[in-house]
Amino acid sequence: MDRKKTLINSSVSNNNSTIKGLQLFIADLRSAQQAQEQEKRIQSEIVKIKQHFDAAKKKQGNHDRLGGYQRKKYVAKLAYIYITSNTTKLNEILFGLEQTVELLKSSIFSEKFIGYMTLELLYERSEVVAKVNDEVNYQLMKDLSSSDDNFVMLALNFVGVVGELTNRLAYNDDITTGVFKILRSPTSSIYLKKKSALSFLALLKSNHSILTEDLQRKQLWIQRILSLLDDTENYRLTLATIPLIEFIAKYIDPSYCTRLLPQLTEILYNCVVVGTSRSSDNQFPLEYTFANMPNPWLITKVVSLLSILIASPTERDSGSLLQTNNIDNELLNKLRKCVSVAIELGTRQAQDPMERIVQNTVLFSLINFASKLDPSDEAISNSVTALCSLLTSKEINIRYLTLDSLVKLCSSSGKPAIDAVRYKNLDMIFHLLNTERDSSIVRKVVDLLYTFTDVENVKIIVDGLLQYILSPKNLAEPQIKSDIAVKIAILTEKYATDINWFVIISLQLLSLTSNTTINDDEIWQRLCQIVVNNPSLHRITCERLVDYLCKKQASEAIIKAAAFLLGEYSSLITDRISSANLFTLFAEKYFSAPNVAKAMILTTMIKLYKTSPEIGSNVIKFFQLELNSLDIELQTRSFEYLNIIQLAKVNGNTDILQILFEPMPPFNSKSNPLLKRLGSLPASAGSTTLINTPSEASSSTPDLLSKRANSSRSIMVPMPPPSRRNTIDDVNSKISSSEDFSGKDSYYSRQILAPNWREGFTRMISHKQGVLFTSSLMKVFYRITTPDAQQPYVFHISLAFINLTEWEITGLSTQIIPSKTQGNPEYLIMNINTPSTATIGPHKRAEQSYEVSIRKPFDVEDSPILAIHFKCGGSTNTINLKTAIGMTTTLISSDVNPSMHLNLAQFISRWKTLSDALGKEGEYQKSGIKLNKDFRKVETISLEDGLLLLTQTVKRLGFDIVDQTSVRSTLFVSGIIHTKSEGNFGCLMKIQYQVNGTVNVTCKTTTAGPLAKYIVECIKNVLTK
């Protein structure tokens, strides 16, 4: 293995001698008994060093009066003073910066090392950077271009450490270019490439524009960086390069990194499957093995990168470019094999604690990644079983990570994972909840229970969580129990099927005293909203609230909820308790309640007076008593209520009371405030919920309880207003999987295209940009580009929607509909971006883009359909356009790749070869193609001019024209069709121009099948109307 001398040894050696003065100085500081003694020693040393440095400035000629050894010693002392003073003595040591820079200029490794090390410590301070930045950059460039690898290594190490501390290095183009040259240079050692990769990552984190400003640089540099992974067995370089590639994929452009899937899969497979195999064929290098696991650091980094590049089947509108249906089956099977082997390793008994930790680390990373691979139900169940077996581990970290992985697995894999947890391991999870003493584990257990709760198990889980809150044996941390109470409230609201149970649980939560949970205003306020909106709950809730008020002690939340609801609906329970008795109950609770609850009780009393004037004397006396309250709010409220009662008596009616205290209208809250308490916790398992977040809500969405409740009346949860969806629906989920007789999706076949769609369709075949559609309302422009010349079968399509009217276009949304989504489709729609805005002002524009990957040949008539939906001038409009993506779109002109150009002899030879090999199987002929209006005038001009127009059209498609004069009326054409899955296909054509203005085309391809027909159809679309 490539070994370098360690920096520690190098830093303390100079011709095999140690810096004794530095060692003595450090020993003196450590032996100081008092801070004053240590400070005195530091100050004396600073004065001494300053004197030596001042004397060095007065050197005569080229004679260095200080010497490298002394300079190194004194700078190292200043660095130690900076460290031991906790960076507080920066201003006292700044005088040494000049001599520190002098060390950088030294040709001795240890001196240069001390210089760089000291500046790495100080460069986080702006005053240091301001003083020496230019000199440091100059010396840094010299060392980066040095022929001594040790000096290059020191410079790279400095860039890697300092690159994220200051933006100045990252914005210095010379330094970034110097680091990149080392990274791409074929003569750089592996050691230097590793350091340069990490240094370049530090620069890139500080300045993304290194790779984003210049497109040519971006393409060239990223491709060079990705090429570092071509050697999949060079694990040392791979380990250092993957973090850089991951950053590029995450923050710069993931489209460049998708081509790495085969290499990454191979690396992961070699480490996890081949490397752990007990077969004699396993030749995995022992130097990369740790705790009987081949390169665990590399495994976790590769999985992290793959997680960015691959989107799981359940992820919608993902920015990832790779879906499981895009990945070759061989690669997908290898990735799945890695997951299954990791599960086997995770369940294997290991005596060594370190080996067990490594096994579990690999297990967690791969199981969290498994949901991206569209796993089978059995694979998901095995993953859950493996994880649950770790819940009994004695190590807190293992239990925590296990629960975290289970939460992610349940939220991403859905029903198979949830069923495996709740049907097989629910008792184990509740046992862990009741016996665990670590608060972080308890939180994760509760999160897991919340994640897989649905209508079937809501009562079991809610009862178990309530028992935990009420049990004195469990953790007494109030915040944990408060969070559990919030989750209980949400679950009962979402999945209650019995209104009695809903009310019982909700009030039981509110009845918990401050000794067991924090009194959350959100819980009782949310309950009041639901009760107000549901008449079926008015009476039953009020009756149970009275029961709680009759108890000697009532919680603050119960008092507040009772004051609010009984003030509104006391008339419904007069057969059980009179208004006078209710007034007495509230009066008893009043003096033990906090001021906020007291204010609510005062309002409740006047509401009771409104429904039962006979209690007026008691109410008036109570208000008069509170006029002397110490709280100004209670004084004011009592005074105002007394005036209202007096005014009502003077008028002889209660109209003013009826107006001021009208019945509470239904709430129309936009969101459940309790959901904010969940943070980033995934949604629970139920597919139908009582509560909908704003993004999920619809005015027509029925609530769950109303469907299942025995009562004819239903709970009506406060619903948000309907939200407009502007996102593009995921193609695979929105389009029906059923197919018609032609193999196309029925949803695709049912689309009715706009009357003028073919004009833009034809233009799109032959031109890379132009007008796709024009109407009185909207004009649509398109542009087709190939992001990567190495992948000519992947196209980036940009669309622009122009509003041609004097009114706003609103509700703009689009849908990209492929002809086929199931059964190995010919092309895939990827990386769909939503329109830049849903509202387009008059004569303004919106933009959108997506990508198409051609996997195998197909007819241009099966191109994707762009469905545009919008409103304008009060009308709702839908425009369906077919976007032309044909086989000719994959052509690369010989101007780009000169090696593709054929002469006449080569053309004739290859034509004969194809005829002998395939006969008529790879051939297609089309005669009598009538030219469109742009060619009709050809009849009146010369043959040469007509052929010239044909030549321009064919070359615009991307074909190469063979230079020849033997057959004047015929064009000899060649090209290469590119596909992702089935490879590349050669194409030869003879295009004969007739005197009557028609064209005959004969096409041969290097494969049997309809490809030749597909190519001719593209040409026919361009030449005809």
Curated annotation (Swiss-Prot):
<feature type="region of interest" description="Disordered">
    <location>
        <begin position="713"/>
        <end position="737"/>
    </location>
</feature>
<dbReference type="GO" id="GO:0072583">
    <property type="term" value="P:clathrin-dependent endocytosis"/>
</dbReference>
<feature type="modified residue" description="Phosphoserine">
    <location>
        <position position="733"/>
    </location>
</feature>
<feature type="modified residue" description="Phosphothreonine">
    <location>
        <position position="727"/>
    </location>
</feature>
<dbReference type="InterPro" id="IPR002553">
    <property type="entry name" value="Clathrin/coatomer_adapt-like_N"/>
</dbReference>
<dbReference type="InterPro" id="IPR013041">
    <property type="entry name" value="Clathrin_app_Ig-like_sf"/>
</dbReference>
<keyword id="KW-0597">Phosphoprotein</keyword>
<dbReference type="InterPro" id="IPR012295">
    <property type="entry name" value="TBP_dom_sf"/>
</dbReference>
<comment type="subunit">
    <text>Adaptor protein complex 2 (AP-2) is a heterotetramer composed of two large adaptins (alpha-type subunit APL3 and beta-type subunit APL1), a medium chain (mu-type subunit APM4) and a small adaptin (sigma-type subunit APS2).</text>
</comment>
<keyword id="KW-0254">Endocytosis</keyword>
<dbReference type="Pfam" id="PF01602">
    <property type="entry name" value="Adaptin_N"/>
</dbReference>
<keyword id="KW-0813">Transport</keyword>
<dbReference type="InterPro" id="IPR016024">
    <property type="entry name" value="ARM-type_fold"/>
</dbReference>
<protein>
    <recommendedName>
        <fullName>AP-2 complex subunit alpha</fullName>
    </recommendedName>
</protein>
<dbReference type="GO" id="GO:0006886">
    <property type="term" value="P:intracellular protein transport"/>
</dbReference>
<keyword id="KW-0472">Membrane</keyword>
<dbReference type="InterPro" id="IPR017104">
    <property type="entry name" value="AP2_complex_asu"/>
</dbReference>
<dbReference type="InterPro" id="IPR050840">
    <property type="entry name" value="Adaptor_Complx_Large_Subunit"/>
</dbReference>
<dbReference type="InterPro" id="IPR011989">
    <property type="entry name" value="ARM-like"/>
</dbReference>
<keyword id="KW-0168">Coated pit</keyword>
<keyword id="KW-1003">Cell membrane</keyword>
<comment type="function">
    <text>Adaptins are components of the adaptor complexes which link clathrin to receptors in coated vesicles. Clathrin-associated protein complexes are believed to interact with the cytoplasmic tails of membrane proteins, leading to their selection and concentration. Alpha adaptin is a subunit of the plasma membrane adaptor. Facilitates interaction between APL1 and APS2.</text>
</comment>
<dbReference type="GO" id="GO:0005935">
    <property type="term" value="C:cellular bud neck"/>
</dbReference>
<comment type="similarity">
    <text>Belongs to the adaptor complexes large subunit family.</text>
</comment>
<dbReference type="InterPro" id="IPR008152">
    <property type="entry name" value="Clathrin_a/b/g-adaptin_app_Ig"/>
</dbReference>
<dbReference type="InterPro" id="IPR009028">
    <property type="entry name" value="Coatomer/calthrin_app_sub_C"/>
</dbReference>
<keyword id="KW-0653">Protein transport</keyword>
<dbReference type="GO" id="GO:0030122">
    <property type="term" value="C:AP-2 adaptor complex"/>
</dbReference>
<dbReference type="GO" id="GO:0035615">
    <property type="term" value="F:clathrin adaptor activity"/>
</dbReference>
